Regions:
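Catalytic cores of large soluble enzymes that bind and process phosphate-bearing ligands
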Residues: 7, 63-70, 239, 243-246
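Alpha/beta enzyme core
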Residues: 12, 27, 31-60, 64, ...
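Short clusters of hydrophobic/aromatic residues that line enzyme substrate/ligand-binding pockets
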Residues: 15, 159, 240
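N-terminal amphipathic alpha-helix/helix-capping segment at the start of soluble metabolic enzymes
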Residues: 1-27
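Hydrophobic alpha-helical segments, chiefly the membrane-spanning helices
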Residues: 262-264
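Short, solvent-exposed beta-strand edge segments and adjacent coil->beta transition regions
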Residues: 23-25, 115, 237
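A hydrophobic, small-residue-rich beta->alpha segment in the mid-to-C-terminal subdomain
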Residues: 229-249
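Conserved small/polar residues in nucleotide/adenosyl-binding loops
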Residues: 250-257
Length: 264
């Protein structure tokens, strides 16, 4: 069995240094204290306490019903025992409709939910909100491509940015978010070539989910990785548990795989 990676405290500066060095960032969603301990022991660099919990924990069809109370509760679960991995907490649907509302809710996610930074969905249309949060010392992670909170508007779970106009718009989104002060970017379900272009065009680290191997890091939904999500999984998801004996060894395998870029 591989040795457990040496634990270290991960900060935004750490992630920036990893990008500069070409070292891949290992990220998973996490929602509770027990998995936090196991994942940190496996050397995961960052957690996204995602509104995906609405689907994998609460049984909803989308992330839309997730509330601020949900995000604070699960963020605090992770923060209570987390010591090393950077914690990114999602801002749920309609919690950042305007800059002042976003500021109040983001402050709660940090103060009550233990977030190191908050994540919100959208691109150029959210630049003013990002700028407002950053001006109040709240670190922001952007999220472009497939936006689960806008799934009805997007017409389902489909790859975004396939055509030239869509690709240009996503590149402009990434650049606008960085200009507004975002320091991390999640890119979901976009073509690998586009993700590589965006990654090389911005200085902030990029985290891909279904966005090819050339992002600065990869993230998967924990329950997808363990193969316990019902229904059909996205094609980019690999079940790491099926070939291992324990959950902790599964996480070590996933960590090593992200480092070697053998899935994405």
């Amino acid at each position: 069995m591989p040795e457990t990676p040496q634990l270290k405290s991960v900060t935004l500066r750490t992630l920036q240094q990893m990008k500069s060095a070409g070292e891949k960032i290992a990220c998973l969603t996490c929602y509770d204290a027990s998995f936090t301990r196991v994942l940190e022991a496996a050397g995961v660099d960052m957690f996204i306490i995602g509104d995906s919990l609405g689907m994998v924990l609460k049984g909803h069809e989308t992330t839309v019903p997730v509330t601020m109370a949900d995000m604070i509760y699960h963020g605090a679960n992770v923060a209570r025992v987390g010591q090393h991995a950077l914690r990114v907490v999602d801002m749920p649907y309609m919690s950042y409709a305007n800059p002042e509302q976003a500021l109040g809710n983001a402050a709660r996610l940090i103060a009550e939910g233990g977030a190191d930074m908050v994540k919100l969905e959208g691109g150029q249309d959210k630049a003013d909100i990002v700028r407002h949060l950053v001006s109040h010392d709240i670190p922001v992670c952007g999220h472009i491509g497939l936006l689960p909170q806008s799934i009805e508007e997007l017409g389902g779970y489909h790859v975004q940015g396939r055509d030239e106009a869509g690709a240009r718009a996503l590149l402009a989104d990434a650049q606008a978010l960085e200009a507004a002060g975002a320091t991390l970017l999640v890119m979901e379900c976009i073509p690998a070539e586009l993700a590589a272009l965006i990654t090389s065009s911005v200085s902030m680290p990029t985290i891909g989910i279904g966005a090819g191997p050339d992002c600065d890091g990869q993230v998967l939904v924990l329950y997808d990785m363990l193969g316990i999500t019902p229904g059909r999984l996205p094609r980019f998801v690999r079940n790491f548990l099926q070939d291992t004996d324990t959950v902790s060894y599964t996480h070590l395998r996933a960590h090593e795989t992200v480092r070697s870029i053998s899935y994405a």
